[in-house]
């Protein structure tokens, strides 16, 4: 797969040899919010680590992630839980994975730290989940309409990444969900099948 062929902006902005690419995701579908108490019990955290003002909610732009907000980055960084227990819980909700998110405004700019665990591992950059998070942030007023948010992921597994996300709100609908980031070419060649 050629990154440039699948993105809308690939080849445009370059920074230190890296090129920025952005992809558009499907319009989101929002599931029924989950109980703070149930989720806190399943992932083994104190319920007061979960903000009251934002729901824990399954969101899909193709693959369903349960967006689980955290009150602070330290609690998110310290997170350790049983993936098997969480997977059993998520199966009942229709979601595939949790996407743990801690959004914060810093100097007027919205940034977020995120984590995504799967099958015993941790993913350093989950674009499909980041699009769901962008949709969730716009839907619940965490992010402004079409505001670019930088999501840092992979810090705790020592593979830090940055994804730039945004989405628009048109009436009751969230649309134009975009996920982008910088990439560097590490290999070029031809594959003959």
What are these regions (language model features)?
Residues 1-193:
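Active-site proximal loop and beta-alpha junction motif in alpha/beta enzyme cores
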């Amino acid at each position: 797969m050629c990154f440039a062929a699948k993105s809308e902006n690939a080849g445009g902005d370059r920074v230190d040899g890296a090129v920025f690419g952005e992809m558009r995701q499907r319009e989101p579908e929002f599931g029924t919010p989950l109980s703070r108490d149930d989720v806190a019990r399943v992932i083994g955290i104190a319920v007061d680590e979960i903000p009251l003002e934002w729901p824990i909610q399954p969101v899909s732009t193709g693959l369903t992630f349960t967006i689980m907000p955290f009150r602070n980055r330290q609690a998110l960084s310290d997170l350790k839980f049983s993936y098997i227990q969480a997977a059993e819980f998520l199966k009942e909700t229709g979601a595939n994975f949790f996407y743990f998110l801690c959004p914060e405004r810093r100097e007027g700019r919205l940034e977020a730290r995120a984590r995504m665990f799967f099958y015993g591992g941790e993913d350093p950059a989950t674009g499909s989940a980041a699009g769901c998070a962008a949709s969730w942030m716009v839907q619940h007023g965490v992010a402004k309409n079409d505001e670019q948010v930088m999501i840092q992921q992979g810090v705790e597994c020592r593979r830090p990444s940055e994804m730039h996300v945004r989405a628009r709100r048109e009436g009751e609908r969230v649309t134009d969900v975009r996920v982008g980031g910088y990439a560097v070419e590490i290999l070029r060649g031809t594959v003959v099948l």
